[in-house]
Amino acid sequence: VLSNIIANQDVHEKYGGVVPELASRAHQVNIIPVVDMALKNAGISIKDLDAIAYTRGPGLLGSLLVGGSFAKSLSLSLNIPLIEVNHMQAHLLAHFIEDNCDVKTDFPFLGVNISGGHTQIVYCRNYFDMEIIGETLDDSIGEAFDKCGKMLGLKYPAGPKINKLANEGNENKFNFSKPKVDGLNFSFSGLKTNFKRFLEKNLKNDKFFIE
């Protein structure tokens, strides 16, 4: 990997979550500067590219359209191949990028995708043959983290902040319901609702409970 540039979208912070329309607009503003910086950091020119890979999905439609349109236009102008990528599959294969990785993985293997939009257990037979054998039936774990964080008054994204606070706290002080789901699937909406009621009950008795 010669360069890896990320443009943060702080515009979502005051809304406590990703706003699709704002995300796509931010993509439009950032995509050219991000590509320019990636090329500069890699020490190459745009004419040195041999192919272009882009996220075909899944994701927010507006943001996908911005990225896809830019990638297709650049591919046509440079007359180089365009490679569509399912970014959830790419997450599972990302560890193959590192040649000096301490832990070597070979096929078949089980992978877990955990993100703001997905929670999946995936059986990977090879680079192109993958099967989801377990997934969330409602909210993803990342979504549950962010929504619970919003209830606590934490800024988006709340997940890392909740994790930090949890590591500093007493894990046995409170008990929450554990979802009962068949097979290898997950469910987090019940836990989120349980947490909401827990906060409402305790704040009713003590308005400084969260403090």
Give the residues covered by each predicted segment.
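A short glycine/serine-rich beta->alpha loop
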Residues: 16-22, 54-61, 132-136, 179-183
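A short helix-loop
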Residues: 103-107, 112-114, 120-209
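N-terminal beta-alpha supersecondary unit
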Residues: 1-58, 87, 91
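Conserved phosphate-binding catalytic cores of ATP/NTP-utilizing and phosphoryl-transfer enzymes
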Residues: 85-109
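Short Gly/Thr/Asp-enriched flexible loops that form oxyanion-binding sites at enzyme active sites
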Residues: 54-78, 97-98
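Nucleotide and nucleotide-moiety/phosphate-recognizing core
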Residues: 43-48, 70-87, 94-96
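Active-site nucleophile and cofactor-binding loops and adjacent substrate-binding regions
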Residues: 55, 66, 82-89, 113-114, ...
